[in-house]
C-alpha cells in the first residue's frame, strides 16, 4: 500500500509551481535570481503570484526575502503599468494566466527602459517622445468651446483601434531598433501621430508632428521588423500606422522641398 504521507507530498507537489524572478535592488547593484514555490489555484495570473509572494516572501529554499517591486493598477489590461518580460516575451502580467505558461515561469523587467527596482522600470522615454511629437489635441483656454468638428464614420473606424494604446512599452521592448545606441521613438508613438493627424482638430498641427518624426529617432529608424504588432496587447495595427505615417512624411518632405518652410500649401493636410 502506498504511504499516505508520500501521497500527500505528491499531491502538494502537483499543486505547486515554480516562479523564477530576476531581482535587483538598485540599478548599480548586482542581479540575483530568486525562486518561489507557489500554490496553484484556478484562474491564477502573474499579479496574484506576486501578491502571494508579498504575503509570504520566502524563497523556495526557505530563505526570507522581501516583497517583489512591480507596477500594476487596473488589472484589466487597460493601464499598461504591469508590462514585464514573462518567459522571454514582453506582455501584461494581469492577463498572463499561470495555466497557459510554461513552467518554471520566468519574470524579468523590460530591458529597453532604465531599471528602477526588481520589475519596475522608468518609461519616461515614451512620454517624452509623445511630448516631442505633440500627441495631443490643443485647445485655447479651459472655457466651453462648444461642439467640435465631426469626424466621418469611416475615419472613426480607423481611429478607434489606434486610440486603445495603453503606453505599456511592449512594442519598444521587442523592437531591435530600440537600444542604447538609437533615439528611435518606437511604433506606439508613430501610431499616435497617425491618430492625432487623423483628428479634425489635431490635423491642424500635423506638420509639426511630421517634422518631429523626420528628425533623429524618427520614422526613418524603423527597419520594418514587424515584431511590434505581434506583442501589442490591444491588437493595434502598428505596421499599418508606420506605413501610413511614412507616406505622410514623404508628402510633407516633398512639399517642404518645393515650397520651403512656412510656405507649403495645405501644410496641415495629410493623405488618407
Task: Give the role of each language-model region.
Residues 1-12:
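Short, Lys/Arg-enriched N-terminal segments with co-localized hydrophobic residues
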Residues 13-19:
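Short structural boundary motif marking the start of a folded domain
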Residues 32-45:
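Short, contiguous acidic and Ser/Thr-rich linear segments
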Residues 39, 86-88:
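Short strand-turn-strand beta-turns centered on an Asx-Gly dipeptide
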Residues 44-66, 105-272:
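Ferredoxin-type iron-sulfur electron-transfer modules in oxidoreductases and energy-metabolism complexes
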Residues 72-76:
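Serine/threonine-rich, repeat-prone extracellular segments and beta-strand-based repeat modules
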Residues 94-96:
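Charged interaction scaffolds used for protein-protein
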Amino acid at each position: 500500500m502506498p504511504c499516505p504521507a508520500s501521497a500527500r507530498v505528491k499531491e502538494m507537489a502537483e499543486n505547486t509551481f515554480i516562479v523564477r524572478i530576476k531581482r535587483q535592488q538598485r540599478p548599480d547593484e548586482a542581479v540575483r535570481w530568486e525562486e518561489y514555490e507557489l500554490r496553484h489555484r484556478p484562474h491564477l495570473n502573474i499579479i496574484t503570484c506576486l501578491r502571494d509572494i508579498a504575503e509570504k516572501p520566502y524563497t523556495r529554499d526557505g530563505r526570507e526575502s522581501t516583497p517583489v517591486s512591480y507596477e500594476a493598477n487596473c488589472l484589466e489590461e487597460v493601464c499598461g503599468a504591469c508590462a514585464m518580460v514573462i518567459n522571454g516575451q514582453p506582455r501584461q502580467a494581469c492577463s498572463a494566466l499561470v495555466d497557459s505558461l510554461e513552467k518554471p515561469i520566468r519574470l524579468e523587467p523590460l530591458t529597453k527602459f532604465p531599471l528602477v527596482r526588481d520589475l519596475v522600470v522608468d518609461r519616461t522615454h515614451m512620454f517624452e517622445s509623445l511630448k516631442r511629437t505633440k500627441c495631443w489635441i490643443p485647445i485655447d483656454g479651459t472655457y466651453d468651446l462648444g461642439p467640435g468638428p465631426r469626424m466621418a464614420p469611416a475615419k472613426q473606424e480607423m481611429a478607434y483601434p489606434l486610440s486603445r494604446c495603453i503606453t505599456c512599452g511592449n512594442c519598444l521592448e521587442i523592437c531591435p531598433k530600440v537600444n542604447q545606441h538609437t533615439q528611435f521613438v518606437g511604433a506606439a508613438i508613430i501610431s499616435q501621430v497617425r491618430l492625432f493627424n487623423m483628428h479634425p482638430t489635431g490635423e491642424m498641427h500635423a506638420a509639426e508632428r511630421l517634422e518631429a518624426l523626420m528628425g533623429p529617432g524618427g520614422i526613418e529608424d524603423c527597419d520594418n521588423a514587424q515584431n511590434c504588432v505581434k506583442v501589442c496587447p490591444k491588437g493595434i495595427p502598428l505596421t499599418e500606422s508606420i506605413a501610413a505615417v511614412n507616406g505622410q512624411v514623404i508628402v510633407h518632405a516633398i512639399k517642404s522641398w518645393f515650397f520651403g518652410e512656412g510656405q507649403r500649401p495645405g501644410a496641415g493636410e495629410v493623405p488618407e
